[in-house]
């Protein structure tokens, strides 16, 4: 995704053990990492207590509250800034999310053309493939057009 999108002053508010943050830093992105629970990386902060962020936001949120993460993210970033969420492709489904997508359409959805492996804690032992499709959902605050779908490796 970073081949086609640029990000600045990134907040990663669900950093866990830092897997995403570390990769972003390797790629030259300035990242501020935190999580509600201390998992040994980044600061400890409740994302829903943040009222404003003067930069972009990239995260892999807990799926059970992903919609809440999207909506809060779009409240705290400034107009024109980006929110990128790594989510299951099935995040596109559902009546409640449909209403959210109508109110806050993503600018681009980057669908992985191959199934990628995800493992809690980064432990890929026992994972030879994935049954789940993932995508990067990218919002730009203030965007009002139709979402574009792109495929990435």
Role assignments for model-derived ranges:
Residues 1-153:
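Class I S-adenosyl-L-methionine-dependent methyltransferase catalytic core
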């Amino acid at each position: 995704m970073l081949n086609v999108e640029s990000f600045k002053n990134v907040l990663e508010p669900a950093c866990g053990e830092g897997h995403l943050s570390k990769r972003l830093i390797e790629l030259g992105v300035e990242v501020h990492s935190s999580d509600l629970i201390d998992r040994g990386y980044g600061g400890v902060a409740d994302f829903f207590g943040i009222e404003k962020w003067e930069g972009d936001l990239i995260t892999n949120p807990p799926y059970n509250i992903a919609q809440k993460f999207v909506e809060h993210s779009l409240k705290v970033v400034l107009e024109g800034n980006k929110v990128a969420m790594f989510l299951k492709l099935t995040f596109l489904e559902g009546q409640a999310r449909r209403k959210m997508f109508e109110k806050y359409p993503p600018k681009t959805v980057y669908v992985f053309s191959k199934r990628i492996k995800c493992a809690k804690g980064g432990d890929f032992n026992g994972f030879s493939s994935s049954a789940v499709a993932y995508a990067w959902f990218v919002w730009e605050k203030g965007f009002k057009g139709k979402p574009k779908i792109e495929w990435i490796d």
